[in-house]
């Protein structure tokens, strides 16, 4: 890949020719035109270098490939630092990448030195910029996503994938679903606490009622002991039975026992009703306990799904870094230059903690036509490319 690049700096005081390249100064930026296939000043790309912060950006020139974008910035090549790194953001906005380019690095260092000879030696070509644009465009289109099976769960194997959704969308859905389950569980716990309180109140009432029936049973026993000696009992104004002595109203002992039995029957009925309510409350508690157990299992299933999703995310991240390393290695392969000759080249590339090795061959048929092919390997994965170049 040629390192030639035409620098143009237009001066407000003069317009001259230096090394066959015109140049100008606009504000603090210096503009450069990429060399075309004839090693002359091209009109497809313009590079603007800022000597103050040692950064650069590449714009379309007056004869850019897309007519409506001519003389406008190229978004993917708008952030270049002093070391030749291009910063881009993935298509889904989730990840920022830094792509290194050797030719851009050499040019940035030469431009920073301000030495004309160094700049002339490290000039870029239009082909350099095309290759760089293709690399960053391919990386920018990468999107971290999650594969789902037909039931909406994270797919275990590629064959089970029925749908792909962005990672942010899937995590938002899982978070909302987990919140709903947690809220339902909390509501069930609140109802259970309320029922427990009601049960305690019923138990207290039952205890008080039992005390009253014990007293009534004692009174009945005392009355039965005196039946043989007394045939009458007194009846007070509130309907209770008293000793016949001194009472205004009296009834037979048998009638008194019947009246007393009716009262105890009503008490027994009240106790039975309370027992029924206690039984229903106990059943409700058991039902709620089962619901809590079911919700607990649901939460455990969600936890397992999140663990599976995290493993998938980690694998996608590793695969992305291997792909970036392979892309970097393939970019380092050289294109054949001499007509009628084969060339073989090898290159290494890396991204983050992943590395890749690439090998390739090429053949130039004539001055205008050349072809090359390459393959890159990284941790068991492989990627390849084949290209044909026509110059006209």
UniProtKB/Swiss-Prot annotation:
Keywords, ordered alphabetically: Cell outer membrane, Coiled coil, Membrane, Protein transport, Signal, Transmembrane, Transmembrane beta strand, Transport, Virulence
Gene designation: eibA
Taxonomic path: Bacteria, Pseudomonadati, Pseudomonadota, Gammaproteobacteria, Enterobacterales
Name of the molecule in the record: Immunoglobulin-binding protein EibA
Principal place of residence: other
Record-linked InterPro entries: Pilin-like, YadA_C
Signal peptide residue numbers: 1-27
Function: Binds (in a non-immune fashion) to the Fc portion of human IgG but not IgA; binding occurs on the cell surface. Confers the ability to survive exposure to human serum exposure. Binds to the Fc portion of human IgG and to whole mouse antibodies also via Fc, binds more than 1 Fc or IgG.
Chain positions covered by the region annotation Translocator domain: 342-392
Ranges where the record places region Right-handed coiled-coil (RHcc): 187-230
Subcellular locations according to the entry: Cell surface; Cell outer membrane
Domain characteristics, as noted in the entry: The signal peptide, cleaved at the inner membrane, guides the autotransporter protein to the periplasmic space. Then, trimerization and insertion of the C-terminal translocator domain in the outer membrane forms a hydrophilic pore for the translocation of the passenger domain to the bacterial cell surface. Trimerizes to make a lollipop-shaped form which consists of three domains: a C-terminal membrane-anchor domain, an extended coiled-coil stalk domain which binds IgG Fc, and an N-terminal head domain.
């Amino acid at each position: 890949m040629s390192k030639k690049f035409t620098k143009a700096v237009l001066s407000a005081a003069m317009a001259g020719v230096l090394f066959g390249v015109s140049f100008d100064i606009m504000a603090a930026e210096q503009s450069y035109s990429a060399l075309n296939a004839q090693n002359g000043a091209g009109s497809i790309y313009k590079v603007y270098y800022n000597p103050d912060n040692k950064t650069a950006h590449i714009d379309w020139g007056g004869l850019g490939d897309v007519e409506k974008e001519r003389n406008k910035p190229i978004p993917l090549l708008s952030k270049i630092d002093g070391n030749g790194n291009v910063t881009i953001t993935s298509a889904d906005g989730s990840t920022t990448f830094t792509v290194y380019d050797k030719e851009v690095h050499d040019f940035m260092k030469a431009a920073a030195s301000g030495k004309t000879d160094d700049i002339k030696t490290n000039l870029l070509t239009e082909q350099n910029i095309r290759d760089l644009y293709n690399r960053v465009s391919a990386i920018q289109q990468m999107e971290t996503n999650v594969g789902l099976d037909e039931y909406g769960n994270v797919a275990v194997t590629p064959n089970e994938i029925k749908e792909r959704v962005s990672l942010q969308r899937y995590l938002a859905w899982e978070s909302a679903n987990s919140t709903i389950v947690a809220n339902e569980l909390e509501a069930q716990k609140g109802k259970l606490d309320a029922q427990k309180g009601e049960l305690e109140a019923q138990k207290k009432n039952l205890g008080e009622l039992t005390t009253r029936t014990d007293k009534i049973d004692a009174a009945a026993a005392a009355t039965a002991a005196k039946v043989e000696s007394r045939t009458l009992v007194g009846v007070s104004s509130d309907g209770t039975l008293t000793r016949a002595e001194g009472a205004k109203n009296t009834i037979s002992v048998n009638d008194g026992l019947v009246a007393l039995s009716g009262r105890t029957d009503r008490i027994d009925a009240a106790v039975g009703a309370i027992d029924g309510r206690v039984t229903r409350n106990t059943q409700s508690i058991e039902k709620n306990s089962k619901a809590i157990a079911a919700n607990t299992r649901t939460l455990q299933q969600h936890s397992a799904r999140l663990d599976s999703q995290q493993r998938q995310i980690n694998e996608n991240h590793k695969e992305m870094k291997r792909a970036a390393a392979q892309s970097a290695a393939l970019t380092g392969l050289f294109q054949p230059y001499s007509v009628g000759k084969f060339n073989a080249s090898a290159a290494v590339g890396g991204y983050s903690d992943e590395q890749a090795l690439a090998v390739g061959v090429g053949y130039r048929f004539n001055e205008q036509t050349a072809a090359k092919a390459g393959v890159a390997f990284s941790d068991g994965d492989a990627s390849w490319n084949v290209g044909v170049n026509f110059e006209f």
